[in-house]
Amino acid sequence: MENTTKPLPPWADKIPEGAFISYETTYKVGEYFSLFKKEHFDSIERPMDYYFYDPTEHGFSKDKAYPLFIFLHGATNALEGDVCINYAGAEFYASEEYQNDFGGAYLLVPLANEYYDEEKNLKGFWDESYTEPLFNLINNFIQTKTNGVSKKVVFGNSSGATMSFKMVTAYTDFFDALIPIGSNNIPEDKILDEYDKNDVHLFFAFGKHDEFHSYEEEILPRIPRLEKMKHCFIFTPDWVYNGDGGIASINFGKEMGQHCLINSMHTNLKLDDGTILDSRLPNGVTGWLRDFLGK
């Protein structure tokens, strides 16, 4: 049911007839936090903390290489403690269901060195200065925490999605796929050409009623170019839903329910009753990943 004590979203008058606004996610946060470990990457240039999940500690063989899924969180999320694992869209990938979908995968959640200054301005969030240090962290993780990895996939939420583009643009021959969620920073054509030359797979996700960026002005003009890529799946839903089937509203001083497409992506593009949110993906995001990985 609608919670009438909540502020009405700016898009409330545009929702389809018969639809309702949902003010809460329906999944449990923290159920899989215990499966992650936290470590510190001690680097002279930029030390960072990170969370990780090791499939070989949870029933998968130690005698093979597994894919590495890297999750880049959105702005302020590094300040949320373990909850950042969920906000980055990584938590459910540690579940038995998701891990079995692609035969095991390492999960890595790097943390930007975020903080608030005396004027309450957020500092230390993802930007280009993190590109090389983050690449070094990833390589260090592979060398010290794994027995080798196969394909490398970068997920990103919001500002983390923009950072995922920056990482793959800087190291195109290193990464195999990226899944940016909620970023308007689609690279220019010559960069997308490099993605194609290196067989990089792109899953581009952006809600048409995103409160932070205009789909019509910033995304739609770039869709034809994305469609020309060798490996690009485009997911731009009319509405972002919570698990109860309601149109999602999140407001912590500013409405962002439609920007937080990460929640639908994290729950594998399915509602609680099993309804599939995109008929092209009957097995959700994990099904797309399984196909990409050749499983």
Place the predicted regions along the sequence by residue.
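A domain-start/cap signature at the N-terminus of enzymes
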Residues: M1-P67, N157, T162, R222, ...
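Gly/Ser-rich "nucleophile elbow"/oxyanion-hole loop immediately N-terminal to the catalytic nucleophile
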Residues: G59-K64, E118-S158
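Active-site machinery of serine-nucleophile hydrolases
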Residues: L68, G74-E132
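Alpha-helical scaffolding within the catalytic cores
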Residues: N86-Y98, T162, N184-E194
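Short, proline-enriched alpha-helix->beta-strand connector loops that line the catalytic pocket
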Residues: G103, D196-L202
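Short glycine-enriched nucleophile-adjacent loop
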Residues: A161-T172
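A conserved short beta-strand
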Residues: D173-N185
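C-terminal catalytic histidine-bearing segment of alpha/beta-hydrolase fold enzymes
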Residues: F203-A205, H209-E217, E227-K295
